[in-house]
Regions:
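Soluble catalytic domains of membrane acyltransferases
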Residues: 1-168
Length: 169
């Protein structure tokens, strides 16, 4: 399942209200799962308006509060750590293991682009799960686009896009 992120509420809604949540494992940014990495991630992800009057205070407090609270919560949910370095192979290997067990993945594909924003362009690295699943399991994965509408409190799942091994990514 490939939902829009919808800020922090998108992942929360998918975990709390998605009807298939019991069989799903969310890809989770490892930068938010490890307490020592959270402060740097929070600062780069712009949790507050850059240049605001309170920025020095926020910079000195929010990242450390987040580091104490968020990692234990994320580690308690069924998830797959997503690495943004050469450890990314661990993300894909764990994902394939879960798919072999009949589990579903929730992959938030949007590229963050600043305070409360996501770029119109999607990340593309996650697509490699398609060829990997084909090579290891001979399964053509189905990618379900999911729209999370916070205003209407609705999660809409669209028709799947099926991976085609003969079509280049």
């Amino acid at each position: 399942f490939c939902p829009n992120h919808a800020g922090a509420m998108g992942p929360i809604r998918m975990c709390a209200h998605f009807e298939l949540t019991d069989s799903c494992y969310s890809w989770m940014n490892n930068g938010m799962m490890e307490a020592k990495e959270v402060p740097a991630y929070v600062r780069q992800d712009y949790w507050w308006e850059p240049g605001c009057k309170m920025e020095p205070f926020y910079n000195a407090t929010i990242p450390y509060i987040a580091a104490a609270i968020i990692p234990p919560i994320l580690r308690s949910a069924p998830g797959v750590p997503v690495y943004h370095d050469n450890r990314v192979i661990k993300t894909f290997r764990r994902s394939i293991e879960l798919l072999k067990e009949g589990k579903n993945l929730i992959i938030f594909t949007e590229q963050p682009s600043g305070h409360g924003e996501s770029a119109a362009e999607l990340n593309k690295g996650w697509l490699q799960i398609g060829p990997m699943a084909w090579r290891t399991m001979k399964v053509a994965l189905k990618f379900y686009p999911v729209h999370i509408d916070l205003e209407k409190r609705r999660i809409t799942v669209a028709k799947p896009v099926v991976y085609q091994p003969d079509v280049p990514l």
